């Protein structure tokens, strides 16, 4: 790896990723050609066909009234990158896709903690997808591009950050796998980190992980592949480090030739030392007592009272510095919470470090929902609701990713009342989309195939109460609701949120010892005050999803392995509680549609649909069933009851698998046409017969056919004759005769599977 000046002022550096028998991937960074007015701009290439432009810009003046770092990350998917015109009404890109939003979060999570604390200038990173090979995913390339452009921008940034996707394929961790290679993977991880240490003794500090088991993991395990256990996941994190180091080195080399010098940016520390000392003097003792209150509401109320008292007592000496007092009070709270965990192995709600809060699980909590459940863990309360529908109701995805439809959709809602607050209610924010995606990925590996369960599934998680990891609560509630809806999951899935606290603790002999304490089932405060939080979902046998964020410059591998093992113990406990509520799929709700799958010959699809959809629309109108036909001849028939579905199937089979009617068969037909000499009656789709006018009067002469029957009338008829040309002659059958007659022989249906 080295930097090259390919033209005057245009530099590039390259990182080569060697995957052995799985091939080599090349990541190239170029600067000096595009977007030259941005503070930093980089074009990143993956094997020359996938091309992203990342720009970083900074405001000239700080937002000194902000008490947070104003970083914005945007990902712009341009449909021309895949040679497509947008499918929207105006034929241009609109709101960002879910893939783009999730990529923004992947970029933000490792970049944000890499900026110096106290920075208040607005920073905006925009990544534009210019070209995309359909065999590639662009998200991890975007992490590297965003880091590289920020590294060049002259900002107080402690990068670079490297990002890599590694997938476990045939026992090997493969970096930057293609979409085709991912189909053979059992586990897929996006890992971001940065180099730490000296040149001779450098390591990679993992900053962020987003991981999941693949859709077909269970089939691969059954075929002999190793299951993605906690041990395997830890090995994958280690396997990602050399790739991250190579990507960081390439960015460093580019910055060495093209980066702007770091500018002068005013920093706004949260508080000065004199404020913290004053707050600690008056608040340490009462705050320590308040932090021992187990209940969240009572603890928060008492803490707020102490904060108001501290503000009042210090106002005279620190007039105009109320924000600093508030920040110092928060810092003191963090210190006390962490000290109690590290020294006493006890937490603010009185639990030990491995204890789980009280668990509760129940199903069928909403009367008319197809499936519903309520899962509670302490003060976190999640309601899961499942809705089943026809496959044609699957979500159509118009993005640059390989996925074009989503049969399983998970939507997560986090209303403000879940934390006892007021706020905006409406379209989901990025956080809600991210939490929903995590819970969705956790369940996908255990969902039945479309052949096993021909339904589109919408899962909604309502966060009704929040005090720690509503996303993992959503995983548990989703499993319960799906089973209640009758979905035959391959295994139940549960999730748990874990935390890690570390610090140097002074021992009795005056020496210091570095301690790491892993916390099971973290509270909201522990999430905010800890050094790492990670969420693990899975079955009793393997991990299905994992999300990790850390502020530490490196976690000892044995510490991480122990924390993952601790998470599995907690997950097993939760699965046992869930099994007491429901341990197998329930009978489907009477309000859920019944969907039957049949096959028709591909060359008969056009006949079933009819010109301009006339035939399929008539079947739908007559039977009340919903019908969806796939290109391979699979037909999904859905109806509120089995009789309607069977009527539609009979009509479809009569067209696609026709059986010639026989003399003596009786049908309830529909009059489709009247003439001077009789009435034509539809027996089956495409099969009509004639009732002569002389047969309509029951032995009496009639002047007009319309005096007896009209178009649209239903009439019971019997086949009297079929001539050598296939013309069918019918005679009316009286109600008495029809009641005594055996049921008519209908066309035999194709093999059907009913759910």
Swiss-Prot record:
Entry keywords, A to Z: Cytoplasm, Magnesium, Metal-binding, Nucleotidyltransferase, RNA-binding, Transferase
Cofactor entry: Mg(2+)
Amino acids binding Mg(2+): 527, 533
Xref: InterPro entries: ExoRNase_PH_dom1 (IPR001247), ExoRNase_PH_dom2_sf (IPR036345), GPSI/PNP (IPR014069), KH_dom (IPR004087), KH_dom_type_1 (IPR004088), KH_dom_type_1_sf (IPR036612), NA-bd_OB-fold (IPR012340), PNPase (IPR012162)
Compartments where located: Cytoplasm
Domain KH intervals: 593-652
GO biological-process terms attached to the record: mRNA catabolic process; RNA processing
Enzyme nomenclature, EC number: 2.7.7.8
A single GO molecular function term of this UniProt record: 3'-5'-RNA exonuclease activity
Domain of life: Bacteria
Catalytic activity annotation: RNA(n+1) + phosphate = RNA(n) + a ribonucleoside 5'-diphosphate
Top-level class of the enzyme under EC nomenclature: transferase
CDD domains in UniProt: KH-I_PNPase, RNase_PH_PNPase_2, S1_PNPase
Domain spans labelled S1 motif: 664-733
Compositional bias of kind Low complexity: 740-755
Residue span of region Disordered: 734-755
Recorded GO CC terms: cytosol
NCBIfam families documented for this protein: polynuc_phos (TIGR03591), pppGpp_PNP (TIGR02696), PRK11824.1 (NF008805)
Family annotation (PANTHER family): POLYRIBONUCLEOTIDE NUCLEOTIDYLTRANSFERASE (PTHR11252), POLYRIBONUCLEOTIDE NUCLEOTIDYLTRANSFERASE 1, MITOCHONDRIAL (PTHR11252:SF0)
HAMAP family hit by this protein: PNPase
Functional note: Involved in mRNA degradation. Catalyzes the phosphorolysis of single-stranded polyribonucleotides processively in the 3'- to 5'-direction.
Family of this protein: Belongs to the polyribonucleotide nucleotidyltransferase family.
Protein name as catalogued: Polyribonucleotide nucleotidyltransferase
UniProt organism field: Mycobacteroides abscessus (strain ATCC 19977 / DSM 44196 / CCUG 20993 / CIP 104536 / JCM 13569 / NCTC 13031 / TMC 1543 / L948) (Mycobacterium abscessus)
Gene transcribed to yield this protein: pnp
């Amino acid at each position: 790896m080295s930097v090259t000046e390919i033209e005057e002022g245009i530099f590039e550096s390259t990182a080569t990723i060697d995957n052995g028998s799985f091939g080599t991937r090349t990541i190239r960074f170029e600067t000096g050609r595009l977007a030259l007015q941005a503070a930093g701009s980089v074009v990143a290439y993956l094997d020359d066909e996938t091309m992203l432009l990342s720009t970083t810009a900074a405001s000239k003046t700080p937002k000194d009234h902000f008490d947070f770092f104003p970083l914005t990350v945007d990902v712009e998917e341009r449909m021309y990158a895949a040679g497509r015109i947008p499918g929207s009404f105006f034929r241009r890109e609109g709101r960002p896709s879910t893939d783009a939003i999730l990529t923004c979060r992947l970029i933000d999570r490792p970049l944000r903690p890499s900026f110096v604390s106290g920075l208040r200038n607005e920073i905006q990173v925009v990544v534009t997808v210019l070209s995309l090979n359909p065999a590639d995913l662009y998200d991890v390339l975007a992490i590297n591009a965003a880091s590289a452009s920020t590294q060049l921008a002259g900002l107080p940034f402690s990068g670079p950050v490297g990002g890599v996707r590694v997938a476990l394929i045939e026992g090997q961790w493969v970096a930057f796998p293609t979409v085709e290679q991912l189909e053979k993977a059992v586990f897929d991880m996006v890992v971001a980190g940065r180099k730490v240490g000296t040149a001779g003794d450098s390591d990679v500090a993992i900053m962020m992980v987003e991981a999941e088991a693949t859709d077909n993991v269970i089939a691969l395990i059954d075929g002999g592949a190793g299951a993605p256990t906690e041990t395997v996941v830890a090995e994958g994190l280690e396997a990602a480090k050399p790739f991250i180091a190579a990507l960081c080195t390439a960015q460093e080399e580019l910055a060495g030739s093209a980066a702007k010098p770091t500018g002068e940016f005013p920093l706004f520390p949260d508080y000065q030392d004199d404020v913290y000392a004053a707050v600690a003097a008056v608040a340490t003792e009462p705050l320590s007592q308040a932090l021992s209150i187990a209940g969240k509401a009572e603890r928060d109320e008492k803490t707020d009272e102490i904060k108001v008292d501290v503000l009042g007592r210090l106002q005279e000496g620190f007039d105009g510095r109320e924000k600093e007092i508030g920040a110092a009070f928060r810092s003191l709270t963090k210190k006390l919470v962490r000290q109690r965990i590290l020294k006493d192995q006890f937490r603010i709600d009185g639990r030990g470090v491995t204890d789980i809060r009280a668990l509760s699980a129940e199903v069928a909590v909403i009367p008319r929902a197809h499936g519903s459940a309520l899962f509670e863990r302490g003060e976190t309360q999640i309601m899961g609701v499942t809705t089943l529908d026809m496959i044609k109701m699957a979500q159509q995805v118009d993005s640059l990713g390989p996925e074009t439809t989503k049969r399983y959709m998970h939507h997560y809602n986090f209303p403000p009342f879940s934390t006892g607050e007021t706020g905006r209610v409406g379209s989901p924010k990025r956080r809600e989309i991210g939490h929903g995606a995590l819970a969705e990925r956790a369940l996908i590996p255990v969902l039945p195939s479309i052949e096993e369960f021909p339904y589109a599934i919408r899962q909604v998680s309502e966060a009704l109460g929040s005090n720690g990891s509503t996303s993992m609560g959503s995983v548990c509630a989703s499993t319960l609701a799906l089973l209640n809806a009758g979905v035959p999951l391959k295994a139940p899935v549960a999730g748990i949120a874990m935390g890690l606290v570390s610090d140097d603790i002074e021992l009795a002999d005056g020496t210091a010892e570095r301690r790491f304490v892993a916390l099971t089932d973290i509270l909201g405060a522990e999430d905010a005050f800890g050094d790492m939080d990670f969420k693990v979902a899975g079955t009793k046998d393997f991990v299905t999803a994992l999300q990790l964020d850390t502020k530490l410059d490196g976690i000892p591998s044995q510490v991480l392995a122990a924390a993952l093992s601790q998470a599995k113990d907690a997950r097993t406990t939760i699965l046992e509680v869930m099994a007491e509520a429901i341990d197998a799929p329930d009978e489907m709700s009477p309000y859920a549609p019944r969907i039957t799958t049949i096959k028709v010959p591909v060359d008969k699809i056009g006949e079933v649909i009819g010109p301009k959809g006339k035939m399929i629309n008539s079947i739908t109108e007559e039977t009340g069933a919903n019908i969806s036909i796939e290109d391979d001849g699979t037909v999904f028939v859905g109806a509120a009851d089995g009789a309607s579905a069977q009527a539609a199937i009979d009509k479809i089979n009569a067209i696609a698998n026709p059986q010639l009617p026989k003399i003596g068969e009786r049908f309830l037909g529909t009059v489709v046409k009247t003439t001077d000499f009789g009435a034509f009656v539809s027996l089956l789709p495409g099969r009509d017969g004639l009732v002569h006018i002389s047969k309509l009067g029951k032995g009496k002469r009639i002047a007009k056919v319309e005096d007896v029957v009209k178009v649209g009338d239903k009439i019971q008829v019997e086949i009297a004759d079929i001539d050598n040309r296939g013309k069918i002659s019918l005679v009316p059958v009286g109600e008495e005769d029809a009641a005594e007659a055996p049921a008519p022989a209908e066309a035999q249906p194709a093999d059907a599977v009913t759910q």
